[in-house]
């Protein structure tokens, strides 16, 4: 009963729920039109995690728009796939709020990348590409080039022609899978920073090549333990990054490193 979109007007002291679908559906992605802060897009995702597994997708999933700062919402459907949907990722072009992209999980006949040139009133599918969305699924528009589109799911890819064709650069060789966040420098679009299950990677050539940043204390450990050696070793199992062990002491001033 606590799922949905919430709004605060006092810096987070109090919150009001402004969009609610049902107890099985929450908000998974949300963007604001940079040229009109009263225009908001919210992607709702029907998903439930249980002790024995999870269910994802259903008739609760959908894309909504508000033009009055969240007071009222309208579901956007024209041109989008009918029936049950799953994860939806959205982005608005910062230089023209009419241009919106949505990465939609649906059945084989409807999934893919959709484009709107009228603030979401109607949509057309420009690509069937949707790299296994899961709970992470992102689409990002280059803030200085509306034809440059990035997609992140399990895999990562980019397009220079508005989604007609795609390339990966050295992403397959040098990026960890499962991409959650992407930042594009608005002053230099060649500089992009990507967050994935493997940590943080950056590129200075528009995602053609990538550098991974090691030794950041951001790994998600599910369990840790110690062995019986002297000095004892500390071991941990990470999210999609294997298990690591290291001595609990080191003779370097930098501490224990990967």
PLM ranges: what are they?
Residues 1-258:
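Beta-propeller blade termini and top-face loops
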């Amino acid at each position: 009963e606590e799922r949905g979109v919430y709004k605060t007007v006092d810096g987070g002291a109090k919150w009001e729920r402004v969009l609610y679908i049902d107890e099985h559906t929450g908000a998974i992605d949300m963007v604001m039109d940079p040229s009109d802060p009263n225009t908001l897009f919210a992607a709702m995702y029907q998903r439930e995690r249980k002790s024995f597994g999870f269910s994802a997708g259903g008739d609760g999933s959908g894309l909504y728009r508000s033009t009055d700062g969240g007071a009222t919402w309208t579901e956007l459907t024209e041109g989008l796939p009918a029936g049950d949907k799953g994860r939806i990722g959205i982005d608005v072009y910062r230089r023209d709020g009419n241009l919106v992209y949505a990465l939609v999980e649906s059945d084989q006949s409807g999934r893919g990348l959709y484009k709107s040139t009228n603030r979401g009133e109607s949509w057309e599918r420009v690509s069937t590409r949707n790299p296994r969305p899961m709970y992470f699924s992102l689409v990002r528009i280059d803030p200085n080039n509306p034809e440059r589109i990035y997609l992140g799911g399990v895999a990562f890819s980019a397009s220079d022609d508005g989604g007609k064709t795609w390339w990966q650069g050295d992403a397959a060789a040098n990026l960890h899978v499962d991409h959650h966040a992407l930042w594009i420098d608005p002053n230099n679009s060649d500089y992009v920073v990507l967050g994935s299950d493997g940590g943080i990677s950056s590129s200075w050539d528009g995602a053609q090549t990538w550098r991974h940043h090691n030794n950041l204390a951001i790994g998600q450990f599910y369990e840790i333990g110690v062995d019986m050696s002297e000095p004892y070793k500390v071991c941990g199992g990470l999210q999609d990054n294997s298990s690591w062990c290291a001595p609990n002491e080191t003779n370097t001033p930098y501490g224990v490193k990967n």
